[in-house]
Swiss-Prot record:
Chain intervals with Polar residues compositional bias: 27-40
Extent of Acidic residues compositional bias: 177-196
InterPro entries: BTF3, NAC_A/B_dom_sf, Nas_poly-pep-assoc_cplx_dom
Biased segments, Basic residues type: 56-71
Assembly with partners or alone: Part of the nascent polypeptide-associated complex (NAC), consisting of egd2 and egd1. NAC associates with ribosomes via egd1.
Name of the featured protein: Nascent polypeptide-associated complex subunit beta
Pfam families per UniProt: NAC
Native organism taxonomy: Eukaryota, Fungi, Dikarya, Ascomycota, Pezizomycotina
Primary role: Component of the nascent polypeptide-associated complex (NAC), a dynamic component of the ribosomal exit tunnel, protecting the emerging polypeptides from interaction with other cytoplasmic proteins to ensure appropriate nascent protein targeting. The NAC complex also promotes mitochondrial protein import by enhancing productive ribosome interactions with the outer mitochondrial membrane and blocks the inappropriate interaction of ribosomes translating non-secretory nascent polypeptides with translocation sites in the membrane of the endoplasmic reticulum.
Length: 196
């Protein structure tokens, strides 16, 4: 037996099947016949955007925060240790300090570092906290470590320091002279005597 519903569908009760639907109707198996409205139609790009956003979360749930994973330096240290072990580095004992001279005249100073070396591969590893210092800060104890290039830079540094001090002394002398060269604004009158 076929029943025609006013919504434009035919349903066969004996077989329990839907025999015919009209294009303007939408029938879902869980609910009764539902008619679509012209406003419920969405273009493809909007519907895919909405379905993609709903796949990740349900309605009313807060947005999921992305967890930022910070790499620890421990993993890098382990890789470095493994590479150094392959190179067969050996520890060097009784190193009090290590100084690295930069081109700008500054020095990277390591106090009591751990030093490992592999002479065949010309590799040295320093472990410790390095501080960048000026060459003048380390001058008394560093003179025996200076090579010919560093000695030349030390001479230049000393010359520039002396020139700077001469310029400062000359500038102070000029300031004193400038105070004496103040012209009188009114000829013949001295206002300083009135103040005293």
């Amino acid at each position: 037996m076929l029943n025609r519903s006013p919504s434009g569908t035919a349903f066969d009760h004996e077989n329990g099947k839907l025999t015919h639907t009209y294009p303007q109707c939408i029938i879902s198996p869980s609910s009764s016949h539902t008619r679509s409205t012209p406003n419920s139609y969405k273009p493809d790009h909007e519907s895919t955007r909405l379905t993609n956003s709903l796949k990740n979360r349900g309605k009313g749930t807060p947005r999921r925060k992305v967890k930022k994973v910070h790499k620890s330096s421990g993993a890098d240290d382990k890789k470095l240790q493994a590479t150094l072990k392959k190179m067969n580095v050996q520890p060097i004992q009784a190193i009090e300090e290590v100084n690295m001279f930069k081109e700008d005249g500054n020095v990277i100073h390591f106090g009591a570092p751990k030093v490992h070396a592999s002479v065949p591969s010309n590799t040295f590893a320093l472990y410790g906290n390095g501080e960048e210092k000026e060459l003048t800060e380390l001058v008394p104890g560093i003179l025996n470590q200076l090579g010919p290039d560093s000695l030349a830079s030390l001479r230049k540094l000393a010359e520039s320091y002396q020139n700077m001090q001469k310029n400062q002394a000359g500038a102070e002398g000029k300031k004193d002279d400038d105070e004496d060269d103040i012209p009188d604004l009114v000829e013949g009158e001295n206002f300083e005597s009135n103040v005293e």
